[in-house]
Amino acid sequence: MKICENLNNITPYKAGKPIEELERELGLKKIIKLASNENPLGVSKKAKKAIKNSLNNINRYPDSFGFELKKALAANLKIKIDNITIANGSNEVLELIARAFVCSKLDEVIFSEYAFVVYSLVTKAIGAKEVIIKSNNYAHDLMAMLDAVNDNTKIIFIANPNNPTGTFIEDGDILNFLIKAPKDVIVVIDQAYFEYTDSKITANYIDKFENLILTRTFSKAYGLAGLRVGYAIASNKITDYLNRIREPFNVNSIAQIAAINTLADKGFLKKSIKINALGLKQLSQGFDDLGLFYIASKANFISVKVDSAMDVFNKLLKKGVIVRPVEMKNFLRISVGTQDENDYFLAKLKEVLLKNNHTYSG
């Protein structure tokens, strides 16, 4: 069997452990999952009703163009339909971008240390060279990224807020970066957690910077992780290129209907943002009380430092708590849950740390 050599360098993406899997393994009755940055509120009631009303039509293919969803997004973002590409989650958008703009093994893709793992996956999958820039206090070093640009640079990926660190780049710094970045290099601002911030880097920026792509998702603040809906905001030219390689029917009909109705449910989004802010404070205070170092976050998760992170992770599993190991030494990423879930996690974490004679980090 002959395969592409670059596939040998790829480690498959490992998602957060499903609740059902832990139930099968340990037979636990109470399990909470704070591993995948999902919305603890669940799903918009408006979206649920629309989903139920649409079930009789699932024998039909979805609208491949996604007209009604694009129309709703365009109205919400105050842009044209031609500036939007819909996808099966924003992960698919990232893959489309890589496929559209990286053409040879000599091409380079720049992203930060401790960045979203999918940037590395899509770069390796197409056989390009990844240029990983050392982080600055767990955050993107934008100037170092600019310094790394050369004639082979095709794409720069910047997650803001970043996953898994939760760090946030202020709008002024993003704007300065966009002004300085070469116009023939695609700059991707991954805004999966945009709704939790007060950033003003919005769709109108694509008129100022033709090389800019904003990517967003319905999986986080909008609570539709299980349906996989993401989208890109970009110039007409970029949108045209992305749609040339986008799979037909890539966003299913239920997902489109759910996204349209969730987008219209402003109360649900407002409540999601509020509970997240309270949860961040709750977890931060809990870590302070335990004397733990954590990275201040603007997303819906916090990364906290503990001795022997994998050992703590496994012991939490046995107590019915699923969190997420990350590629930062001795860090675990904790998604914001409900108040009760956060309390339960903090109590179980304290039990584990006491048994481990944990040396608190600062």
Annotate each language-model stretch with its function.
Residues 1-60:
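N-terminal "arm"/small-domain region of PLP-dependent enzymes with the aminotransferase-like
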Residues 30, 80-84, 105-108, 152, ...:
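Short acidic capping loops at alpha-helix termini that bridge into adjacent secondary structure
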Residues 277, 285-319, 336:
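Conserved PLP-binding catalytic core of the aspartate aminotransferase-like
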Residues 65, 211-287, 292-295:
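PLP-dependent aminotransferase class I/II
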Residues 62-108, 126:
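Phosphate-binding glycine-rich loop
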Residues 100-158:
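PLP-dependent aminotransferase-like
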Residues 124, 142-151, 164-187, 191-221:
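Active-site pre-lysine segment of PLP-dependent enzymes
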Residues 315-319, 325-362:
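PLP-dependent enzyme catalytic core of the Aspartate aminotransferase-like
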